Amino acid sequence: MNRLHDLDKIKFGMRYTIYSPLDGQPCMDHDRSEGEGGGPTEYTGIKMEVVQWSKAALEAIGNVVEGKKVFLVAATLRPETMYGQTNCFVGTTLDYGLFSANDEEIYVCSYRAARNMAFQDIIRPRDNPVKLAELKGSLIIGTKIKAPFSVNPEVYVLPMEGVLASKGTGVVTSVPSDSPDDYATLMDLRKKAEFYKIDPEWAALDPVPVLSTPTYGEMTAPVLIKQLKIQSQKDTVRLAEAKELAYKEGFYKGTMSIGEFKGMPVEEAKPRVRQKMIEAGLAFAYAEPDRFVKSRSGDECVVALMDQWYLDYGEEKWKAQAEKLLERMNTYSSETKHAFEAVLNWLNKWACARTYGLGSKLPWDPQFLVESLSDSTIYMSYYTVSNLLHSDMTGSKPGPLGITPDQMTDEVWDYVLASGPFPSNSDIPKESLQKLRHSFDYFYPMDIRSSGKDLIPNHLTFAVYNHVALFPERHWPLSMRANGHLMLNGKKMAKSTGNFLTLRQAINKWGTDATRLALADAGDGIEDANFDDTIANASILRLHTLIGWCQESADGGSGYRTGDFTYHDRVFQEEFINLAAETKRHYEATNYKDALKSALYETLMARDWYREVTFEEGMHSDLVRQFNRTLVLLMAPITPHVSEHIWTTVLKEEGSIQTALWPDPPASYQPCPDLIAAGQYMRGTLKTMRDAEILLMKKKAKKGAQGGPAAYDPAAEKKAVNVIVANRFPAWQDDSIEIMQRAYDEKTGTIDDAKVKDELAAKGLLKDKRIMPFIQLQKKRIAQLGAASTFRRQLLFSEVEVLKLLIPYIKKNLKLTDVSVMTVEEARSSSAAPDTLIEQSEPGSPAINFYNP
């Protein structure tokens, strides 16, 4: 805090802050039971003086306002549109108070708004607004008021259905030219004046052009109402859409059509109009929380304007540094990065002191305590030296260097953490200080800060700001990871509902490793994870099965062989080496669900395929041991105890698995993508053959029911298949690929669709209904596999040779008497299949023809 103060990052002055009147101090995020992340929203309070009360209102208030001016106060975010006021709205069912603002003025608004005003010195006394009278909104209807800055000097108060007591002041100034809500309500009132119990003359003023936009002209609201087909003020969904469109278009693209700032962009005119109104005494600055905020003491919070110490977050240069860190820091997901960016855009002047509670005293102003979130942003750096400074968890016992807390002065900390000069006035031995600095330099910057997503709006963003302020760039954080909350069986954990589980309960129920496995499976990232009982239960069996497999395979036996590796051996080895590399990438990215998938599920799938496809000759004993060793190493971060047991007791490896190296291949290893592709091809082709036979079985059943013969009988004693392999793609596909390749932009990674269509049309290919679906499929492949792989369209292996190696397994698995692998040309010359079926064959996707010999 001292160094931030020295750097002028902490300042003192009047500012808006969320404040708890009951607690008598600012209410920051960790002091709230509701409304975390909420901050002040600043409005312009428009003072609309009462000219003539409605008869009902006059009777209700009596003589309480004698000698004072009375103003209806509206809170607006668009002061630049006040030139176009045609009326004012109130909610007929809402309660409005007449509050004494000062000796000469009375303000009409909701109690909630008056309470906020009282803590901003708008209404006196400061902490207790005096309510002189109360009125239902329905009684105010028909009151004539002044409309400051409007071309219509006087307007009437009218009813509106959507006015909220929880937002603004409960009084809404109406500008129907630019507010869709105002225009829709005004039209409703004109159509049904009798229903709404108003005099038609009160709603007679037409919308006034205030600003001009390129899209909607000078009547933004009427145009949007017509375009979106909004029928009344009850169409809240489309009105919300229209409101957003109107505000964005008006603020960013609009120019003023009226008043002193006519012709000026709205973005520039808005603050000037506001200032003019305030200087003329026709308006004032007003703020309130942007959402409902409740303190932990149960108090509804307000926005207070007060002198206080604050961290100058949002200051231009400091913010630029924070953005620089965010740009280079790994956030592990775009959602997390966008969340940080959003916070940096709104975070501004954070109150860093309070009057009571837990916390350290503010060093230069000890009447205040440091707010809890403000001094918890660089404590990670303390972890790097804490073991040298104290020998117990509480810090009450000196550490091995024998340094006491009072010796750790600001100058000493500068030397240790900020590469400052050697503190000549310190009585700590130089050797000890050097050890502290060395320990910090060795461990910092932090590689990762993992925390909840709810801390992005405060703690984590504060850590970004304070690290760039206090540390040189080489010590800036390398990454921050935000995670969601943990649900239990798809529902939010809550003691009140009984859907609650502690870590100790989980360990007692499922054991440590099964619990860890279920937690890894629960999910990663910023979305909420889900711990599932069924996964935890299944994990126990899965781990016992894993131990059993390793024990059985380690014992050896006649089922294993030795000698040279076969093709299936090489495919299997390449697959688990590749899965080890993939798992490593997932662990490094802290994606534990994906790591579990590749480390356990996909690895065991590869083993199962290998075991089945080598049923005749058996698995290779050396390869199985290498696989088991790799498998337990991959699983060690998730299931350390089971992995340790298998490593030492079953595999008889030396030392602990915790000190073993990751199973990276040797430096001489050369990846073989052709083997990976062949493995995927074999599994995919077998599935295609199964699916094809199932389809034939369904057709047979259907024809049998209709009394017709079937060409192939899956139940026959003798069954065979011809697998027909194509050496080249159809000409229309080759033509399409060539056209796409010419239309591909390497810089943007996109296809020029117009160019593709032009070339297809020129070659007469557009009429072929197969073309466009094929092109869309290739676009997806480009996104998934890259342009080079998609355009190359060549298999990395010999399809015929791989299929011939697979023949024994195909026969066994599908219970076939014969399997023939042939080329398209061979199939045609021998009439091994109908021509229509042969034509379906493509490289990587053979045609399948079942028959009964």
PLM regions and their residue ranges:
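Acidic, turn-prone loop/beta-hairpin segments
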Residues: 21, 29-36, 559-584, 597-601, ...
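Secondary-structure transition/capping motifs at alpha-helix termini
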Residues: 7-12, 152-153, 189-205, 279-285, ...
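Amphipathic alpha-helical
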Residues: 5-39, 109, 113-135, 140, ...
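Alpha-helical recognition segments enriched in aromatics with Gly/Pro capping
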Residues: 50-52, 147-149, 153-165, 176, ...
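C-terminal low-complexity, glycine/proline- and small-hydrophobic-enriched intrinsically disordered tails
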Residues: 533, 537, 655-853
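Conserved phosphate/anionic-ligand binding catalytic regions in large, soluble enzymes, centered on
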Residues: 4, 72-91, 295-296, 300-302, ...
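Residue patterns forming the tRNA-binding/recognition surfaces of aminoacyl-tRNA synthetases
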Residues: 1-83, 142-146, 152-154, 167-370, ...
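Protease-associated
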Residues: 79, 83-89, 94-171
